[in-house]
């Protein structure tokens, strides 16, 4: 047991208490880093070739806020990111390239810049690029929130 009166002021604060700081990642600065990652590691080696956007005040924690993860994913022509599913929900905002796809529970969607695709929790999904140009999209997942509830797990197909 512990006395509430000794910790109450740190449990319930008069103002929000967050380590999240505002930050901007400029496309002109990030695009080439993402494209360069294609020569550093293959999609097969990485499973998902992603550069994580970490909040500068949360280095090493793989999160952009207390509850959200974000990363920039690259799939080169001819590559496939194999099917898997996980308890986290995901969103994808396509930023560069035309013609790659995301398939959610077998339903294939061709991706173009500006498209917004959601992947509900625990749905099988994979990505592939049948086009002749690299594809980049922003991945957003609720990984930190799901981790907070100790509910994070995943399954690979086969």
Language-model segments: which ranges?
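Activation on folded, globular domain regions of eukaryotic proteins
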Residues: 23-27, 65, 71, 138
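Short, structured patches in soluble enzyme cores that scaffold and shape functional sites
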Residues: 74, 95, 123, 129-131, ...
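Short histidine-centered beta-strand/loop micro-motifs
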Residues: 61-64, 80-86, 129
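Transition-metal
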Residues: 1-55
């Amino acid at each position: 047991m512990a006395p509430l009166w000794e910790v109450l002021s740190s449990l319930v604060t008069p103002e929000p208490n967050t380590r999240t700081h505002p930050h901007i990642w400029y496309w002109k600065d990030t695009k080439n880093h993402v494209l360069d990652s294609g020569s550093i590691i293959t999609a097969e080696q990485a499973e998902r070739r992603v550069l994580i956007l970490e909040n500068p005040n949360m280095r090493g924690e793989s999160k952009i806020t207390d509850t959200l993860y974000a990363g920039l994913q690259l799939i080169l022509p001819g590559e496939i990111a194999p099917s898997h599913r996980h308890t986290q929900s995901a969103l994808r905002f396509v930023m560069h390239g035309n013609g790659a796809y995301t398939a959610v529970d077998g339903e294939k969607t061709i991706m173009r810049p500006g498209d917004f695709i959601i992947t509900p929790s625990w749905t099988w999904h994979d990505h592939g690029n049948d086009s002749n140009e690299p594809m980049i999209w922003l991945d957003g997942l609720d990984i930190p929130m799901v981790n907070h509830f100790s509910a994070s797990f995943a399954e690979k197909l086969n």
